[in-house]
Amino acid sequence: MSLLQISEPGQTPAPHQRRLAAGIDLGTTHSLVATVRSGQAEALSDSEGRYLLPSVVQYQVDNINVGWQAKQEAEKDPANTISSIKRMLGRSLNDITSRYPNLPYHFHDNDSGLPLIKTPAGIVDPIQVSADILKALAERAIQSLGGELDGVVVTVPAYFDDAQRQGTKEAARRAGLHVLRLLNEPTAAAIAYGLDSGKEGTIVVYDLGGGTFDISVLRLTKGVFEVLATGGDTALGGDDFDMMLADWIRERAGFGYQNDVILQRQLLDIASETKIALSDNDVADININGWKGEITRAEFELLIQPLVKRTLLSVRRALKDADVDVDEVLEVVMVGGSTRVPLVRQMVGDYFKREPLTSIDPDKVVAIGASIQADILVGNKPDSEMLLLDVIPLSLGLETMGGLVEKVIPRNTTIPVARAQEFTTFKDGQTAMSVHVVQGEREMVSDCRSLARFTLRGIPPMAAGGAHIRVTFQVDADGLLSVSAMEKSTGVEASVQVKPSYGLSDTEIANMIQSSMENAKEDLQARRLAEQKVEAARVLESLTAALQEDAHLLTEDEKTAIDNVVDTLIESVEGTDPVAIENAIKQLDKQTQEFAARRMDTSIRQALAGHSVDEI
């Protein structure tokens, strides 16, 4: 099939018509945001010229501090100042407390098993904390670029599982960001160095941050990166260098090992400054609490050499897992601020027998790679630089109740690809389901392109929501779409095949994407209204069935009260205010709670009738 250009309508070299996009490196210790301006990728700084934003959030009763200010408050308010939240994404409360037993946070006991943290601002989860960090970065980008962002690419570790990736996406959504794509951090670093358009082969990304070490082995084939193996150490980073040096200073200065939190903080701060100084100098002076001394780079390297060797053990394991020899590695990319330490670069270079890539600031390289990808995905590249891929040009999905579109495969997904989702029945006793396959970016079916329809029959009669139908979308290398629907308990199945691109010109694709962008706010409002109307219909149908069966459990006054609320709900459904419908549903739910309780009591009594205690 022909290659499809990832391009957006209205793209032009004119700066005032460029779409605004950003790449975000959501890190464990620090986060960054970058963009492409005048053809050059650059990290964006805050008003004080700082590029790094500490991944720290402090929650107060009427205020939320993010970044440097939050970090300064960490000592005074540790319980409400949350850091390293990335470690908690997609993990259960039990998992987190067993891995990190000394966390100062007040966790909220809950049946869900999720790590919910109690703060003066309310209960927050890791997704919300991540969202607050993303929001701060987005605000920095908006201020720097002078307009709202059309989309972002957010990076994640290559080893992140689906729950962690979905958590990252949800955090971006809560921050009000449109995620163009999640990009693996090592892939972003490789893109920053232009390796995606270079020679095919194996690339190693060595990422030594403040708190963690990650190693990734990638294979580049025809412009596509495949992750062959990942590894690392979640308890090893530049902070450990600081601790080794702080202990050295403590011993030399004769401070002893008393439990002095303030002194330990001072020692770590001095150690960090000294480490940075030794990256450019052979000797560094130390002055703390009246003690003066100096340390040579050679002495410092002797301290940290065992830690660097530990990283190389992880490298060896990852190469073994990938079944790759050291001699097969084409390039080694250095990521993370701790790779500035000369000994790290030297030992990594010696291990791979080649000079690692270090010309891009290792703190910024991931965000820069993400910004390059984001710029491509919103269509800012001129034709001569267009990324060519076999991709799905428009999202593929199906119609759900209320004329809504559920996107199954988003646009710009590389093919071949297969995705599946589960759906259920809307009505009691439903034995068939009509599957309407659509194409487009709008929220309502009426605004999208209809591709095919088929019907799944033979669904066992069940209560609404009881049946589980798995719908699978599969696009092969030739762009042929196969859609199948299967009822899981019986295995009954139906399917259809269609060519989504047939009869669709580039101009029509561009117009459909342009239309989705121009109508985004109205579409979301229409979707919310439709969703509330569907929920109202479900609630009313359920109540009607309940009243037909058990109306005798209500007094006349209670029936009248319920009828009045039902009338309010029906009236709101005829309107265009989703909030009014939502409030009416809540009011009806409150009005019928006692009725529901009586029905439950009656059902239990009927089930127990005629049975002795022993039988039960």
From Swiss-Prot:
It comes from Proteus mirabilis (strain HI4320). Keywords: ATP-binding, Chaperone, Nucleotide-binding. The keyword ATP-binding applies. The keyword Repressor does not apply. InterPro entries: ATPase_NBD, Heat_shock_70_CS, HscA_NBD, HSP70_C_sf, HSP70_peptide-bd_sf, Hsp_70_fam, ISC_FeS_clus_asmbl_HscA. It comes from the Bacteria. Belongs to the heat shock protein 70 family. SUPFAM superfamilies: Actin-like ATPase domain, Heat shock protein 70kD (HSP70), C-terminal subdomain, Heat shock protein 70kD (HSP70), peptide-binding domain. CDD domains: ASKHA_NBD_HSP70_HscA (cd10236). Disulfide bonds: none annotated. GO terms for molecular function: ATP binding; ATP hydrolysis activity; ATP-dependent protein folding chaperone; unfolded protein binding. Chaperone involved in the maturation of iron-sulfur cluster-containing proteins. Has a low intrinsic ATPase activity which is markedly stimulated by HscB. Involved in the maturation of IscU. PROSITE patterns: HSP70_1, HSP70_2, HSP70_3. This is Chaperone protein HscA. HAMAP family: HscA. One of its GO terms (biological process) is iron-sulfur cluster assembly.
